């Protein structure tokens, strides 16, 4: 069976991870965060990609698409090998730019079905405040204002155009992510009850 994929996009701090946890609990999806996979990979002492990933993340740049897709593909294959019923995936924080999207279409065409794009729309200042708050406890090296402003610029220049592209195909489901966690999840449930 082919993986059934929902791409989850939104700026840093839009609440993607929090909402994905709830979707997993309620709808049985497997959550794959492109960022978490990259962060885990760079910590592995024997990783062929570790140092490269580290330098990209530190500079707030987008990691080369081949690396990210190979990690996503491996994670989906491992999940499905362990449990044949687990074929629904939330892919969070990918595709981040046109190169990502083309790489996905080149590599995964016919191997996975993208059902829709869940887009958490949130103003930049709210996103920054949330990330600074999270940075106090998360220990993430990129949760500081300077890094965040770079990440938001990257997001606006690179990821927003992807959302616009998907909007033309009618695949984008947009949620106002500036509301409380519960209010946002109510909207998310409406979408998943209809779509998948």
UniProtKB/Swiss-Prot annotation:
SUPFAM superfamilies registered for this protein in UniProt: P-loop containing nucleoside triphosphate hydrolases
UniProt-annotated stretches for the region NMP: 33-63
Gene3D superfamilies reported in the protein's UniProt record: P-loop containing nucleotide triphosphate hydrolases
Chain sites annotated for binding CMP: 100
Protein name: UMP-CMP kinase
Taxonomic lineage of the native organism: Eukaryota, Metazoa, Chordata, Craniata, Vertebrata
EC top class, as a word: transferase
Cofactor: binding details: Binds 1 Mg(2+) ion per monomer.
Cofactor: Mg(2+)
Organism of provenance: Xenopus tropicalis
Keyword entries, A-Z: ATP-binding, Cytoplasm, Kinase, Nucleotide-binding, Nucleus, Pyrimidine biosynthesis, Transferase
Glycosyltransferase among keywords: no
Pfam family, one: ADK
HAMAP family documented for this protein: Adenylate_kinase_Adk, Adenylate_kinase_UMP_CMP_kin
One GO biological process term: 'de novo' pyrimidine nucleobase biosynthetic process
Record-stated family: Belongs to the adenylate kinase family. UMP-CMP kinase subfamily.
EC numbers on record: 2.7.4.14, 2.7.4.6
Subunit structure: Monomer.
Residue stretches in coiled coil: none
